[in-house]
From Swiss-Prot:
PROSITE patterns: RIBOSOMAL_S8. The lineage of its organism: Bacteria, Pseudomonadati, Pseudomonadota, Betaproteobacteria, Burkholderiales. NCBIfam families: PRK00136.1. GO terms for biological process: translation. Keywords: Ribonucleoprotein, Ribosomal protein, RNA-binding, rRNA-binding. PANTHER family: 40S RIBOSOMAL PROTEIN S15A. Signal peptide: none annotated. It comes from Burkholderia mallei (strain ATCC 23344). One of its GO terms (molecular function) is rRNA binding. One of the primary rRNA binding proteins, it binds directly to 16S rRNA central domain where it helps coordinate assembly of the platform of the 30S subunit. Part of the 30S ribosomal subunit. Contacts proteins S5 and S12. Pfam families: Ribosomal_S8. Gene3D superfamilies: 3.30.1370.30, 3.30.1490.10. This is Small ribosomal subunit protein uS8.
């Protein structure tokens, strides 16, 4: 059976794994998921990630990060969904928690944070909020 929203599935797997304090979580891999994982790693929300290819199916492994026994990611919320896409221009990209969090945006120049998209001067699809 095919998945209707693979990105929402990725975010839910991360949330669920952190609630039960797992060290890592694995999921089917795709280019967009790897790009989101790279942004999460660059921003310090996860320790690391790796893509393991087993023939035709690749798997994305994400090493989760904790601080003082609590998950580093407190909020992980999907914004743009298959039924209602959310696009924002370069001047309309929202700040998450007044700049304490990050909005992950898919732009023509790749997947990046809200700060980088504003600095680059591009808008795009707001994928999710992370705090």
């Amino acid at each position: 059976m095919s998945m209707s929203d693979p990105i929402a599935d990725m975010l839910t797997r991360i949330r669920n794994a952190q609630m039960v304090e797992k060290v890592s979580v694995s999921m089917p891999s795709s280019k967009v998921k790897v790009a989101i994982a790279q942004v999460l790693k660059d921003e310090g929300y996860i320790d690391d990630f790796a893509v393991k290819a087993d023939g035709a199916k690749a798997e994305l492994n994400i090493a989760l990060k904790y601080y003082a026994g609590r998950p580093v990611i407190e909020r992980l919320e999907r914004v743009s969904k298959p039924g209602l896409r959310v696009y924002r221009g370069r001047n309309e990209i929202p700040q998450v928690m007044n700049g304490l969090g990050v909005a992950i945006v898919s732009t023509p120049k790749g997947v990046m944070t809200d700060r980088k998209a504003r600095a680059t001067g591009v808008g795009g699809e707001v994928i999710c909020y992370v705090a």
